From Swiss-Prot:
GO terms for biological process: aerobic respiration; electron transport coupled proton transport. This is NADH-quinone oxidoreductase subunit B. GO terms for molecular function: 4 iron, 4 sulfur cluster binding; iron ion binding; NADH dehydrogenase (ubiquinone) activity; NADH:ubiquinone reductase (non-electrogenic) activity; quinone binding. The keyword Translocase applies. It is an enzyme of class 7 (translocase). It comes from Parafrankia sp. (strain EAN1pec). The gene is nuoB. [4Fe-4S] cluster binds at C37, C38, C103, C132. It catalyses: a quinone + NADH + 5 H(+)(in) = a quinol + NAD(+) + 4 H(+)(out). One of its GO terms (cellular component) is plasma membrane. NDH-1 shuttles electrons from NADH, via FMN and iron-sulfur (Fe-S) centers, to quinones in the respiratory chain. The immediate electron acceptor for the enzyme in this species is believed to be a menaquinone. Couples the redox reaction to proton translocation (for every two electrons transferred, four hydrogen ions are translocated across the cytoplasmic membrane), and thus conserves the redox energy in a proton gradient.
Amino acid sequence: MGLEEKLPGGVLLTTVEKLANWSRRSSLWPATFGLACCAIEMMSTGAGRYDLSRFGMEVFRASPRQADLMIVAGRVSQKMAPVLRQIYDQMPEPKWVLSMGVCASSGGMFNNYAIVQGVDHIVPVDMYLPGCPPRPEMLMDAIVKLHEKILAGSVSGKVEHTKVGSAPYPKPIEVATAWSGLPAGAVDTRTLSVNDRKRFSLPEDAPVPAGRGAVEPVLDERRPAAIAPPSVFGRGKRVPVDAKPTDESRAGGPGPSTETLTDD
């Protein structure tokens, strides 16, 4: 006499892991995290034509504490990298990450100092989706494959993701130096502010690199004159840019001691 003869009809036997993973797969709530044009395809997937709600994913949450899946749709800039990591840390376990499009997966066409060359430098990625941008059918296929991975997972402890490098995420200047082909220790001034850029600028007597040609310096005396506000230098007065107002000029007098040009 088998076990099925002792149990009443309608009883289904399964394991706790299968039941828990089935529940996770059937109620996967994505976080609202569209970064670029791939987000348009992600929104189309959630609309009525493709109906992502068939997979229990129609609820896009604006709060990371209520989301299970982060769909990184679009390229990740250097300034967005710490924000993305913070949102990922705020998501409760278990959580998954889907990299949508080549820009999110590897930087895509934006191979420069401003874009992170792959979101897996910041967060662990469970599913990579190619395309520029991927169609809604491709996103749904990636989600189905992620469902299969969730069903095969374990409920004990944390969910195993693809590992991120053990080193902390580098600063933008360090990343730009590594990606731009500059020698070690060099600084890519494109990532600096205007004030910091002056500290790394070449001196006036520095030799010009070969192939670039000499650049004629702009002398102070060649600067064009600017029309000063009437409240400072008097109405209709034209003075050099470097000229400073005097007490006499404030009262509408002849102006600063330097040469003053009139409208005549």
